[in-house]
């Protein structure tokens, strides 16, 4: 009888011990899941902070109205510096997010870390490019030279740096998945319909500055940025069918020399001459200096505006890739490997590509 009672008591102890162990295991599992989901909340908040910082920074610096007709070229440099600061602040937040992801317990974050590192590399390249552009611009008036009869070529090294910076931004954005529009380049522009106002060796005739302003006003910004990306430079006088870089760096010539290959080339040349070091516009006819200044500011703003659009699209695409990767983070009770079906909740944002 005593043996039977002892067996029963032993069985009860074993059952109670088993129940206790099971309850403890369930408690630990629940705590692990709570810790996992708390980490996801922090990651989600950090992600939203990145969108906010980037949107505010680039939104404040949007370049379609970056310069006015009486501004110095240094204003262009300040714009690029502002964009660069926004990108740097975004990268800092991205690095902080990477730390949050790395520290997340009970989660397989390998893919997320890879995507964040890739996005960080894109930001670094964009920062380098806008820094290069900021250093390439001059510090004289946007429409420098309106009181001097002879136009002057923009510094070739400065123009080359601008071309390189623009090309780098476009290449980075293309690799991120941004569709770069070719735009409508328009047709060739005769010397008398605009080029004469920026390259010839004597004061422009009445109406020349207005014709230049009209050509710039109708230019497609996408086509302008494409022309800058593919531009060449020259050491010599302007010639027929010159591209944007050649017109900007051409030495002054007789009034009938130099035509633009397309409307977009002419407008892009105006932007390059107005941004780069050394470039001077030809003295306009009496009371037409305002038209040259307007053309210069408009051309620069079109280029800056499209560059900002391209940068914004590239960064938004990279952040979108992070968003999708974060949504796929899975819970793991033991090793951090994805062994359970619990996944992160979707992160919402208001950004667009």
Curated annotation (Swiss-Prot):
<protein>
    <recommendedName>
        <fullName>Variable large protein 12</fullName>
    </recommendedName>
</protein>
<comment type="similarity">
    <text>Belongs to the variable large protein (Vlp) family. Beta subfamily.</text>
</comment>
<feature type="lipid moiety-binding region" description="N-palmitoyl cysteine">
    <location>
        <position position="19"/>
    </location>
</feature>
<feature type="signal peptide">
    <location>
        <begin position="1"/>
        <end position="18"/>
    </location>
</feature>
<keyword id="KW-0449">Lipoprotein</keyword>
<keyword id="KW-0732">Signal</keyword>
<keyword id="KW-0472">Membrane</keyword>
<dbReference type="Pfam" id="PF00921">
    <property type="entry name" value="Lipoprotein_2"/>
</dbReference>
<keyword id="KW-0614">Plasmid</keyword>
<feature type="lipid moiety-binding region" description="S-diacylglycerol cysteine">
    <location>
        <position position="19"/>
    </location>
</feature>
<keyword id="KW-0998">Cell outer membrane</keyword>
<dbReference type="InterPro" id="IPR000680">
    <property type="entry name" value="Borrelia_lipo"/>
</dbReference>
<dbReference type="GO" id="GO:0009279">
    <property type="term" value="C:cell outer membrane"/>
</dbReference>
<comment type="function">
    <text>The Vlp and Vsp proteins are antigenically distinct proteins, only one vlp or vsp gene is transcriptionally active at any one time. Switching between these genes is a mechanism of host immune response evasion.</text>
</comment>
<keyword id="KW-0564">Palmitate</keyword>
């Amino acid at each position: 009888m005593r043996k039977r009672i002892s067996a029963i008591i032993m069985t009860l102890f074993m059952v109670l011990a088993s129940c206790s162990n099971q309850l403890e295991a369930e408690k630990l599992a629940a705590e692990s899941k709570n810790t996992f989901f708390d980490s996801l909340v922090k990651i989600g908040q950090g992600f939203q902070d990145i969108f906010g910082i980037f949107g505010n920074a680039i939104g404040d610096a949007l370049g379609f109205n970056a310069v006015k007709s009486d501004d110095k070229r240094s204003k262009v440099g300040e714009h690029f510096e502002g964009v660069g600061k926004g990108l740097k602040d975004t990268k800092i937040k991205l690095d902080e997010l990477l730390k949050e992801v790395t520290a997340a317990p009970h989660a397989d974050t390998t893919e997320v870390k890879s995507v964040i590192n890739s996005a960080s590399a894109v930001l670094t390249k964009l920062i380098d490019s806008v820094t290069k552009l900021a250093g390439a611009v001059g510090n004289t008036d946007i429409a420098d030279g309106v009181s001097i009869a002879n136009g002057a070529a923009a510094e070739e090294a400065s123009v080359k740096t601008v071309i390189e910076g623009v090309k780098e931004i476009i290449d980075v954005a293309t690799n991120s998945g941004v569709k770069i529009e070719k735009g409508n380049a328009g047709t060739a522009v005769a010397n008398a319909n605009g080029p004469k106002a920026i390259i010839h060796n004597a004061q422009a005739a009445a109406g020349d500055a207005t014709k230049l302003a009209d050509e710039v006003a109708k230019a497609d910004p996408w086509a302008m940025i494409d022309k800058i990306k593919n531009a060449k430079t020259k050491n010599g006088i302007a010639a027929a069918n010159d591209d944007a870089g050649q017109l900007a760096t051409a030495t002054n010539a007789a009034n009938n020399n130099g035509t633009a290959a397309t409307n977009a080339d002419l407008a892009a040349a105006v932007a390059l001459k107005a941004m780069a070091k050394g470039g001077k516009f030809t003295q306009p006819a009496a009371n037409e200096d305002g038209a040259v200044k307007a053309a210069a500011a408009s051309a620069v703003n079109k280029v800056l505006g499209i560059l900002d659009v391209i940068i914004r699209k590239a960064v938004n695409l990279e952040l979108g890739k992070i968003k999708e990767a974060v949504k796929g983070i899975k819970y793991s009770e033991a090793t951090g490997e994805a062994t359970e079906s619990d996944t992160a909740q979707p992160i919402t944002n208001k950004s667009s590509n």
